[in-house]
Amino acid sequence: MSQAEMSTCSTPHTQRVFQEAVRKGNTKELQSLLQNMTNCEFNVNSFGPEGQTALHQSVIDGNLELVKLLVKFGADIRLANRDGWSALHIAAYGGHQDIVLYLITKAKYSSSSR
């Protein structure tokens, strides 16, 4: 692993950069970051200070493109936030019908492939 890759894998730094890209809704930056972290021990399902994962935050923001990207890189759609709400609960409550449909489709597909 190169020095640049090791600095990218620095967990506290990486977590901050990751959360900031999610907050900004910056899909290109997040995709680049996730692709560069494939060799890292980085958990896309880690919780931020608000008790949300990046997926939960993207659903709250109504950002379907970011939701799809996070799921592609392993975000767990069944994981609950600190209030016990899954991404699907948050999407339904927020009126994000496109995200609701996407999450239902992903849940149906993943449960049928078991």
UniProtKB/Swiss-Prot annotation:
Promotes loss of intracellular domain (ICD) of Notch1 in embryos. By down-regulating ICD levels, could function as a negative feedback regulator of Notch signaling that attenuates ICD-mediated transcription. Involved in angiogenesis. May be involved in somitogenesis. It comes from the Eukaryota. Belongs to the NRARP family. It comes from Xenopus tropicalis (Western clawed frog). This is Notch-regulated ankyrin repeat-containing protein. Forms a ternary complex with the intracellular domain (ICD) of notch1 and rbpj/suh. One of its GO terms (biological process) is Notch signaling pathway. The gene is nrarp. ANK repeats lie at residues 50-79, 83-112. Keywords: ANK repeat, Developmental protein, Notch signaling pathway, Repeat, Transcription, Transcription regulation. It holds the Pfam family Ank_2. PROSITE patterns: ANK_REP_REGION, ANK_REPEAT.
